[in-house]
Amino acid sequence: MSVHRLALSRAGFAIAALLPVSVLAQVADTTDDAHPRFIGPLASPAPPLPRGVGNIEPYLVTTTAPAFFDADGHRIDSQATTQWDVIVPIQYGLTDRLTVGTTLSAAYDRIVAGGRAAALGDTTVSALYGLYDGAGGNRARLAAGLRQRLPSGHHDHLEDPRRVASGSGASSTTFALQGQAYFLDGHLRARASTAWRLPGSHARIHGASVYGTDAGFIGNARLATAQTTTVSAEYSVHPRWTLVGEAMYERENGHRVRGRDTDGLAVDVHAPASWRFSLLPAVQYHLSDSVGVIAGVQLGVAGRNTSAVVAPQIAVNVGF
């Protein structure tokens, strides 16, 4: 090979070898200069998606209850139980204002027969409609949502040693209002939401159930209203990293269980109202504008007649 050709060959090889490095450098530069990224906190819902845009965010959650709050709000230690849940929200923008979605779930828990088993959880279908889209730096948005819970999980016949408690048994309707705005030149995003479960939900019960009934019971549970309120803030410290602070207040106005036990005696029990206040710190890592990971924990810090949950969780958010 001539010296001239050898020189050209070496030059070509050097250029080819440097091209990936150059591309990576450009990508790194682009990443460093990129805008702040957000994928949403653990609990506060998102506003409607643009038309033709979809989102899926599978969660893996492990929940323990090392204590409970009594009727006076005192924290009392208890034997911790652990349950694993997979929760998969899926949303799609039909128009710029209307987003439809569904949430699938499954539980993996200990069973009476020993070991663990999995079961399908309740399913939710939803519709979200944008009420206001603001201009300017804050880009404030307001939306209203309607969610219907379908009782696809297990809530009774729990005396079966192979059966996992994974649902409520009740078809319920929830109405929600939620808002979002940006601050600090787009580096801080705030969300707030409140949701009300409408009255009238009820579940038929046979045997042992999530409502505290025993084997042989036949009757029903009627659920009162419930409310969940969240506030959150996401702060972008780097194009790839976002810190999340969130608080959640949940209130259940009790339920009533009526029926007959295994001896044929009448049962009429009113469960008291309960509430819980939780903190949900989290951190986000963004692989790109459309893919990110969030990891955090729900910590029940105060309440009445409810468990002091500790629920570490991780999710992958994918836009498409």
Task: Describe the role of every protein-language-model region.
Residues R51-T63, R163-D263:
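Detector for outer-membrane/organellar transmembrane beta-barrel domains
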Residues T82-V86, R116-T123, A140, G167-T173, ...:
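Residues that define the transmembrane beta-barrel architecture of outer-membrane proteins
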Residues A28-T31, V61-V86, D160-A165:
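Surface-exposed strand-loop-strand hairpins of Gram-negative outer-membrane beta-barrel proteins
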Residues L60-P66, I76, L104-R110, L131, ...:
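Transmembrane beta-strands of outer-membrane beta-barrel pores
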Residues R97-T102, G134-G137, G186-A190, R240-L243, ...:
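Repeated loop/turn-to-beta-strand initiation elements of outer-membrane beta-barrel proteins
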Residues A25-A67, A135-R139, A143:
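Outer-membrane beta-barrel biogenesis signature
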Residues T63-I76, A215-F320:
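Outer membrane beta-barrel transmembrane domains
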Residues P45, I56-P58, V88-Y92, T102, ...:
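Residues on the lipid-exposed face of transmembrane beta-strands in outer-membrane beta-barrel proteins
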